[in-house]
């Protein structure tokens, strides 16, 4: 779990997302509150529930990007889902309980990686011994007992030194490795029957889990395989499940995107299985309930839910009142200006201009963007957004692709050249398309 302070979290998000200070502060405080809650004593800790967040703002201003970056910072089970993928229980489609099942699977993977990292040193030592056993099978006497001669030991140490220095990397050996899941059994089941399906699948998987098979491979590949094999042996599956469930219950974060798309439209009186029905099904999850997963029962009382939507057609008040009450923190993200676009092109880590420079450098072409050129690109994107649909920062991708079209096509024939992209180059490449509204609508 992340122990970063809110200031550090915001600083980290600033490296990737321009503006939107309120949204960054809200998610930073929410993430820090997870850590604060874990410092409390048990009777009070159970009573402190997370304050769920609703992010409201036009498309392309950074809502989803904040979620993506937060997932990397959180070091906690995290899942991002689209609200439009779900239907009410009993109808064809995914039900909302699958969010928690997927989150638990994500936690299992995360905890497993942490346990493997923790046991890596022991696994590396064991893997090294298995490689040396394959290279130098221990001598046996006539009764089949292993003899331990000093000469054998010194030879083993010499091989160990060569192995660690990488001198044996390309030598091929034959090793025994776990067969793993040899029976690729995939069972399809109707919605609601996932639990039975998972039990059947684990039964078939366990049938072949203890088998080993011989494989011939290079030592450098064998070492990686054996380290994974040994690390897996050091992990207790039951303990792993319990740790994963605890991680989900105490630190889990669910990001629900496009929540405005499940708002009720007008005075429609029929069954609304993918809109209001989904909202009603989300209520118990957000409020706190127990969900059955293949790893065990998971309580959702302390999972943090962050919902986001553009709310261009619907309004937050169109959500059913019970769900509104369960999303107490509202954050509005502002539309981006031309100055914001200019900063987006240059300031973030791995900005668009840096990406294009790196891509062209692979062909031996050096690209330089002048300050004036960046300003012109930002203005062009902003004007097209104003004239047509406002798709926010995503417009920069279409504008940059149009600008770099000729260079991208001819780069393989321009090895060793330097291309200076200035204001005149930008005006020549984008001028006509930006000025003509019809062309803007269909090309950018």
From Swiss-Prot:
This is ATP-dependent protease ATPase subunit HslU. A double ring-shaped homohexamer of HslV is capped on each side by a ring-shaped HslU homohexamer. The assembly of the HslU/HslV complex is dependent on binding of ATP. One of its GO terms (biological process) is proteolysis involved in protein catabolic process. ATPase subunit of a proteasome-like degradation complex; this subunit has chaperone activity. The binding of ATP and its subsequent hydrolysis by HslU are essential for unfolding of protein substrates subsequently hydrolyzed by HslV. HslU recognizes the N-terminal part of its protein substrates and unfolds these before they are guided to HslV for hydrolysis. It comes from the Bacteria. Belongs to the ClpX chaperone family. HslU subfamily. One of its GO terms (cellular component) is HslUV protease complex. The lineage of its organism: Bacteria, Pseudomonadati, Pseudomonadota, Gammaproteobacteria, Pasteurellales. Residues 143-163 are annotated as: Disordered. The gene is hslU. Signal peptide: none annotated. It comes from Haemophilus influenzae (strain 86-028NP). It holds the Pfam family AAA. It is found in: Cytoplasm.
């Amino acid at each position: 779990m992340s122990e970063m302070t809110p200031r550090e979290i915001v600083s980290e998000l600033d490296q990737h997302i321009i503006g939107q200070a309120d949204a960054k502060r809200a998610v930073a405080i929410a993430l820090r509150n997870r850590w604060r809650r874990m410092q409390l004593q048990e009777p009070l800790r159970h009573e402190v529930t997370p304050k769920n967040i609703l992010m409201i703002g036009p498309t392309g201003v950074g809502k989803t990007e904040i979620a993506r970056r937060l997932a990397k910072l959180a070091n906690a089970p995290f899942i991002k889902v689209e609200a439009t993928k779900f239907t009410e229980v009993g109808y064809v489609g995914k039900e909302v309980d699958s969010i928690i099942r997927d989150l638990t699977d994500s936690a299992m993977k995360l905890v497993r990686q942490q346990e493997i990292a923790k046991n890596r040193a022991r696994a590396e030592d064991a893997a090294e011994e298995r490689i040396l056993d394959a290279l130098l099978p221990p001598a046996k006497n006539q009764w089949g007992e292993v003899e331990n001669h000093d000469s054998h030991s010194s030879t083993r140490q010499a091989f160990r030194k060569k192995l660690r220095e990488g001198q044996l990397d390309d030598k091929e050996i034959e090793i025994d490795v776990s067969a793993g899941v040899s029976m690729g059994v995939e069972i399809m089941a109707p919605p609601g029957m996932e639990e039975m399906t998972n039990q059947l699948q684990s039964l078939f998987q366990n049938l072949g889990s203890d088998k080993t098979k011989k494989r011939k491979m290079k030592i450098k590949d064998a070492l990686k395989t054996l380290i994974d094999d040994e690390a897996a042996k050091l992990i207790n599956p039951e303990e792993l499940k319990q740790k994963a469930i605890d991680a989900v219950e105490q630190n889990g974060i669910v990001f629900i995107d496009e929540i405005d798309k499940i708002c009720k439209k007008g005075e429609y009186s029929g069954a609304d299985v993918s809109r209001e029905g989904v909202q009603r099904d989300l209520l118990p999850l957000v409020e706190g309930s127990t969900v059955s997963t293949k790893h065990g029962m998971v309580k959702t009382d302390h999972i943090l839910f962050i919902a986001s939507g553009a709310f261009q057609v619907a309004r937050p008040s169109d959500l059913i009142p019970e769900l509104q009450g369960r999303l107490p923190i509202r954050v509005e993200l502002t539309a981006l200006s031309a100055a914001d676009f200019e900063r987006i092109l240059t300031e973030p880590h791995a900005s668009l201009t840096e990406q294009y420079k790196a891509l062209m450098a692979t062909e031996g072409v050096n690209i330089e963007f002048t300050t004036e050129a960046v300003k012109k690109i930002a203005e062009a994107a902003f004007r097209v957004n104003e004239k047509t649909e406002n798709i926010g920062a995503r417009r920069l991708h279409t504008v940059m692709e149009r600008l770099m079209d000729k260079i991208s096509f001819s780069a393989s024939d321009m090895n060793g050249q330097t291309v200076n992209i200035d204001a005149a180059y930008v005006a020549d490449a984008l001028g006509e398309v930006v000025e003509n509204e019809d062309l803007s609508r269909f090309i950018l």
